[in-house]
Amino acid sequence: MRIFYKTLLFSVLFLIYFSASGQSNRLFVAHYNVENLFDTIDDPKTNDEEFLPEGKNKWTAERYAHKIGRLSQVVRAMNAGAGPDLLGICEIENRQVADELRKSIHQKGRNYILAHFESPDNRGIDVGLLYDSKKFKLLHAQSLTVILPGEKPWPTRDVLLVTGQLKNKTRLHVFVNHWPSRSGGQEKSEINRMAAAKTVRRAIDSLLKVDPTAHILTMGDFNDGPADIAPRQIMGADSLPNGPSPLYNPFLALNSDTTQGSYNYRGSWQFIDHISMSTHTSSSNSKLKYLAGSAKAEKFDFLLEKEGRYAGNPWRTYAGSNYLGGYSDHLPVSVQFELRK
């Protein structure tokens, strides 16, 4: 009997060791549109009036704290409960709200740090990157200004570019995006997303000119599906893992399945949130190897409406000005990589 228990104990320790070892050699990357994460303080420089205690949405300190708690629950649930290594976020009002989200996560073994710059967007919403400093060492961060076409272009969200070093000494460049919306219709507004795509593509081309084997990720809410012109043709995120385009977008393979997606529009799922990567991450000798088939929406059951007309849709915070107390109108998306020596 004693031999049996010793054998059992050894087996358990063996599994724990190799599970932890496997986890340390993986990189879990996600992006999440957190849907209007505003504080309750009026910023006279932005149009944040709807998200004030006396505003249309009656955005109180209690509702704000509830939202922070909801979002941190989502982050903790990712990666089989271990949380992501890198997490892009968008629709954050400012650094303060993003930092409060960071501090509320309380993920054991994690040390999340925030990379963020204020954007010129009229509503004041920005993008940011939360990274675990144990897995990603920050080397450089900058914002890329997107200039929209027209005689009087309105300001839009900047693109965040963060460069860091992974545990295996690989340098990684991460672009976090929140491209202009489809307000006014997809075709009419497409020119604005094309401007954002050109901004990112110029930066990617510059990186690849210096280092043709540069490891690059682009993530975000693109307000376009993977097959649309701006992300696929202009930014250059195509469907071939080792193709001629600078980027590979694994979400293209999921794009035609209307039962999958990060956003539900009139009953049809779409991947307007997606993640692309350098094409060589699929090669056998890459130090950052994409795990084929890992691209997905994080469709946790608790993130979905349970009943009524919108059952199965993302459980959002508001429907119009009607407070629902949910999470977000988007689902997170994620991909995984193997870190090689």
State where each predicted segment sits.
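Extracytoplasmic/secreted cell-surface and envelope-processing proteins
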Residues: 39, 96-99, 123-126, 183-186, ...
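Extracytoplasmic, non-cytosolic globular domains
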Residues: 116, 160, 164-255
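Structured beta-strand-rich core segments of catalytic domains in phosphoester-bond hydrolases
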Residues: 92-171, 175-179
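N-terminal, active-site-proximal structural segment of metallo-dependent hydrolase catalytic domains
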Residues: 20-111, 115-125, 303-311, 315, ...
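Active-site beta-strand/loop signature of hydrolases that rely on acidic residues for catalysis
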Residues: 29-34, 59, 64-67, 71-98, ...
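Extracellular/periplasmic catalytic domains that process cell-envelope and extracellular macromolecules
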Residues: 23-25, 80-82, 106-108, 120-124, ...
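Bacterial Sec-dependent N-terminal signal peptides
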Residues: 1-24
